[in-house]
Amino acid sequence: YTNSRAEKRVNDRIAELEIESFLPLQKTLRQWSDRKKMIEKPLISSYVFVKALPKDIYTVRKIDGVVKFISIQGKPVPIPEEQITNLRILCGSDAEVQVSTDFYAKGDLVEVTVGSLTGLRGELIRVGRKHKVVIRIIQPGMNLTVDIKTNAIRKLEKNEDI
């Protein structure tokens, strides 16, 4: 994971260290008031994929612009080679690709899974910015709304009630 708009610079520095990396880029037409230009822009903002040995991880983390590795319990998570191959195919095609991280939609029934509100269920009423959502929690005699991060909720299955 990189600082915003630092993907190309980070990818170049990793390449200088002779460590294999992949920055999925997509060609897109950018329009200014006076001209149009075809530019290459990262397909997934703030991500550079690195095929690093354990000894290289610290070296990569020290690169200016690198924020962190995707990790679980402090250990970097490997991305399956098949997924990287699929990204390479997408980037090599002429298809216009749009990346969406919104897995929730207005009206979804959700349950809070983290924090002091764990177990509360409600209806998602707004998907906001920065991975936040607003949910309406219906309790007897009350109608509450709560701002909460998307990683603190789960979508209820169709057979689950609020």
Named regions from a protein language model:
Residues Y1-L109, L124, V134-I162:
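Acidic-enriched and Gly/Ser
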